[in-house]
From Swiss-Prot:
The active site is at 57 (proton acceptor). This is Pup--protein ligase. InterPro entries: Pup_ligase, Pup_ligase/deamidase. The reaction mechanism probably proceeds via the activation of Pup by phosphorylation of its C-terminal glutamate, which is then subject to nucleophilic attack by the substrate lysine, resulting in an isopeptide bond and the release of phosphate as a good leaving group. Disulfide bonds: none annotated. It comes from the Bacteria.
Length: 452
């Protein structure tokens, strides 16, 4: 597919502390965070004017699902708009706490693990056609996804029985299957639950749940952009060498524990290869493929960053990407802090730095401190992100949903929406079914809006 629908869902970690002590349970914090949402949406599961979905997931994790985007820059912008929306809820909730005489700070973390060892996810969605075998898609993708953390992991200090280690990925320790229909109990790499949120005869939604939540915008661009290119190669019938792994679940942990990318992992055919070699194989095929096909500026940026990141890992010169790739930015931050204060990697103060990198409150989070200092590269502009909080992408179905919600709210009409349905809850119960996610103009929706 030359034009694809993308979407990102991020679950956020939440806590409330007072002088370092836990003040409210996650359930209570979530209630404060969502009080404003519930007051206008009558639910903790709502769609917003920008076409996104905001809801409270299992285990009191706020989750933000971006609207459908058909280009990577829009996706990065809307992913960041989700952070800003949640930051707004956080500021509101803190005001309410103060009004009720409760002292404490609320923290929202865009990360994937908490101190108790629980994991929550960043789920990537890619629209693919029904043609071709889904199992072949998964077979080719799994070695790519297992090793992809080398180019876009969020980084993590992991406590192990042998001491603390710096890992590439937060999510790797929590993945237990290759392909499965579960998302929480067994946590596969690819989730196979068949919910296309589109015409099921034409489309399928590839649901990847192995990735980390990224703070750095270029890391998000590379995570989704590289995966899109691999999908395009599979769809075009490019012959890719069989890189199947003997045990993907063991391999994903081995890769995560080795930021040099050199550790040998066993292939299904009995040979061995490193994560670096596997990624270089995918990259070289991608470069050949796009040389023949031609490419746009954003795809060029993805290829350039992919190549530079692998070169940085291969040569050990991390300065090549220390403004763009999360695990490298965070590693540099932690190493500088350790050197300044003469601390071991296992120090609780280092764990604090690790966590503070993911704090979405811009006046407090360490990633945003680096952004203010101009120490990280950007993909989006702040104005774009601000606008995306209330404006949907203009080239996908999200535009129809966003316009419908905006008009219904302005006219104070009762309505129900999901990814495909737009419904006015009046006597006639008029409903429009929007099965084509690429369609941003629809006379039926315009009529429904005009009738309000």
């Amino acid at each position: 597919m030359d034009r694809r629908i993308f979407g990102l869902e991020n679950e956020y970690g939440v806590t409330c502390t007072f002088h370092g002590q836990r003040r409210l349970s996650p359930d209570e914090v979530a209630r404060y965070l969502f009080r404003r949402v519930v007051s206008w949406g009558r639910s903790s599961n709502v769609f917003l004017r920008n076409g996104a979905r905001l809801y409270l997931d299992v285990g009191s994790h706020p989750e933000y699902a971006t609207p459908e985007c058909d280009n990577l820059v829009d996706l990065v912008v809307h992913d960041k708009a989700g952070e800003r929306t949640l930051e707004g809820l956080l500021v509101d909730a803190e005001h309410r706490l103060r009004e009720e005489g409760i002292t404490g700070d609320i923290y929202l973390f865009k990360n994937n693990t908490d101190s108790a060892g629980n994991s929550y996810g960043c789920h990537e969605n890619y629209l693919v056609t029904r043609q071709g075998e889904f199992s072949r898609l998964a077979d080719v993708l799994i070695p790519f996804l297992v090793t992809r953390q080398l180019i876009c992991g969020a980084g993590k200090v992991l406590a192990t029985p042998r001491g603390a280690v710096y890992c590439l990925s937060q999510r790797a320790e929590h993945i237990w299957e290759g392909v499965s229909s579960a998302t929480t109990r067994s946590r596969p790499i690819i989730n196979t639950r068949d919910e296309p949120h589109a015409d099921a005869e034409r489309f399928r939604r590839l649901h990847v749940i192995v990735g980390d939540s990224n703070m750095a915008e270029p890391s998000t661009l590379l995570k989704v952009g590289s995966t899109d290119i691999v999908l395009r190669m599979i769809e075009a019938g490019v012959v890719l060498r069989d890189l199947s792994l003997e045990n993907p679940i063991r391999a994903i942990r081995e890769v995560s524990h080795d930021p040099t990318g050199r550790r040998r992992i066993r292939m299904a055919n009995g040979r061995e290869a490193s994560a670096l070699e596997i990624q270089e194989e995918y990259l070289s095929k991608a470069q050949e493929f796009l040389e023949r096909r031609g490419t746009d500026a954003v795809t060029k940026r993805v290829l350039d960053l992919w190549e530079r990141t692998l070169r940085a890992v291969r040569t050990g010169d991390l300065s090549l990407v220390d403004r763009e790739i999360d695990w490298v930015i965070k590693y540099r931050l932690i190493e500088a802090y350790r050197a300044r204060h003469d601390l071991p990697l296992s120090s609780p103060r280092v764990a604090q730095i690790d966590l503070a990198y993911h704090d979405v409150k811009r006046t407090r989070g360490l990633y945003y401190l680096l952004e203010r200092k101009g120490a990280v590269e950007r993909v989006a502009h702040d104005v774009q992100i601000f606008e995306a909080k209330s404006t949907p992408p203009q080239t996908t179905r999200a535009r129809l949903r966003g316009e419908f919600i905006r008009h219904a709210q302005e006219k104070r009409r009762d309505f129900t929406v999901d990814w495909v349905h737009l419904k006015l809850n009046d006597q006639a119960q008029r409903t429009v079914l929007c099965k084509d996610p690429f369609r941003s103009v629809d006379e039926r929706v315009e009529k429904l809006i005009a009738s309000m």
